[in-house]
Amino acid sequence: AASDVYKRQVFEDVYSIIADRKIHPKEGSYTNYLFDKGIDKILKKVGEEATEIVIAAKNPEPEEIIYEISDFLYHAMVLMVEKGVTWEDVTQELAQR
């Protein structure tokens, strides 16, 4: 359905904004803060967010899981941009599985 395509486009749109922030830094941007701090900070945040998903999954409210997965995906996209990995790379890998 058209709405499904739009929903998937959100991933590309957020990724594009993150990639643009790397090329055109914006003062006060959390994304730029992560890029400025470097790979260790980015990896730390990815790990923290993954752990928060696990903790949220133990609770009965799905909203908490949704929130934490969204945080994780954002930080994973920062990592993807930092390492030059695209959604095309990821979707091709998933399609092969």
Map each language-model feature to its residues.
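Short, small-residue-biased leader/transition segments that mark boundaries at the very start
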Residues: A1-Y6
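Alpha-helix N-cap/helix-start motif at coil-to-helix transitions, marked by capping-box chemistry
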Residues: R8, E12, K37-E48
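A charge-rich, low-complexity, intrinsically flexible signal that marks solvent-exposed coils, linkers
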Residues: I17-D20, P25, L34, Y74
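Active-site flanking loop/helix segments enriched in acidic
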Residues: K26-I42, A57, E61
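C-terminal end-helix/capping segment
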Residues: V85-R97
